[in-house]
C-alpha cells in the first residue's frame, strides 16, 4: 500500500480513533513503511495534538469530558495494550515454569 505522508497520517488518525491505541511495529507492517517513518509520523501527530505517544506506539487523546475517560485504565485495556510483546514474553516465561509453580500476573495468564 503506497501512500504519501498526508494519506498515511490520516489513516493513522483513523486507526487510533477506532482502536484507541496503535503500535509502531503494527503500523509499519500495515503501511509497508519503516518503523522510523512511522515514529516520525507519530511525532508529527503528537505535535499537532492529535495523539499522545508512548514507548512503541500512540494512543487517542482523551477529552476528559466523560466519566469513563477519567477513570484508571482497567484490566481489559491493559491486557489488550501491547498484546503481541506480552505474548512473546509469556511464551519465553512459560519455558521456565514447571508443574506446581504459579504466578498471578496477567502476562502468564495469556498462556492459560
Curated annotation (Swiss-Prot):
The keyword Cytoplasm does not apply. This is Putative galactitol utilization operon repressor. Keywords: DNA-binding, Repressor, Transcription, Transcription regulation. The gene is gatR. Repressor of the gat operon for galacticol transport and metabolism. In K12 strains the operon is constitutively expressed because this gene is inactive. PANTHER family: AGA OPERON TRANSCRIPTIONAL REPRESSOR-RELATED, HTH-TYPE TRANSCRIPTIONAL REGULATOR SRLR-RELATED. Residues 5-60 form the HTH deoR-type domain. It comes from the Bacteria.
Amino acid at each position: 500500500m503506497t501512500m504519501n505522508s498526508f494519506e498515511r497520517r490520516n489513516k493513522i488518525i483513523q486507526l487510533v480513533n477506532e482502536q484507541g491505541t496503535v503500535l509502531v511495529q503494527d503500523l509499519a507492517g500495515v503501511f509497508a513503511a519503516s518503523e522510523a517513518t512511522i515514529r516520525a509520523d507519530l511525532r508529527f501527530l503528537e505535535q499537532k495534538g492529535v495523539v499522545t505517544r508512548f514507548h512503541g506506539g500512540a494512543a487517542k487523546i482523551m477529552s476528559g469530558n466523560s466519566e469513563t475517560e477519567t477513570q484508571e485504565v482497567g484490566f481489559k485495556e491493559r491486557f489488550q495494550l501491547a498484546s503481541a510483546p506480552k505474548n512473546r514474553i509469556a511464551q519465553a516465561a512459560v519455558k521456565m515454569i514447571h508443574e506446581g509453580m504459579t504466578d498471578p500476573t496477567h502476562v502468564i495468564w495469556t498462556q492459560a
